């Protein structure tokens, strides 16, 4: 199985991720210059940290990740949601920060509690990427 990130690996991912908090949501956006959608943001952050995930959708990231339980989820893993809009499969992805918190490209990119009344009803799984 894929290993959880070390503290220093997570620190590097978090440092990149927090640079863009407050950036507006842009459908299809995948760079700091264009703005980000949820999967564009996650792909950018991980690609900048030595991963090779390319540019894919939330469902594509789900397919590239090892599926883990919430109890196994560690900071730097991905958290997935279904039904946030009308698309088959996973419709939203965020970077799990631990303690029920994530950072993701809503409008704008922001921190959120995955167990809030909104996110809890769409929560559908956790994944761990491998380098």
What are the residue ranges of the model-derived segments?
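Hydrophobic beta-strand signal
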Residues: 78-80, 95
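Catalytic cysteine-centered active-site loop
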Residues: 23-75
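Structured beta->alpha junctions
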Residues: 31, 83-85
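Aromatic- and glycine-rich peptidoglycan recognition patches
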Residues: 51, 67-70, 85, 89-131
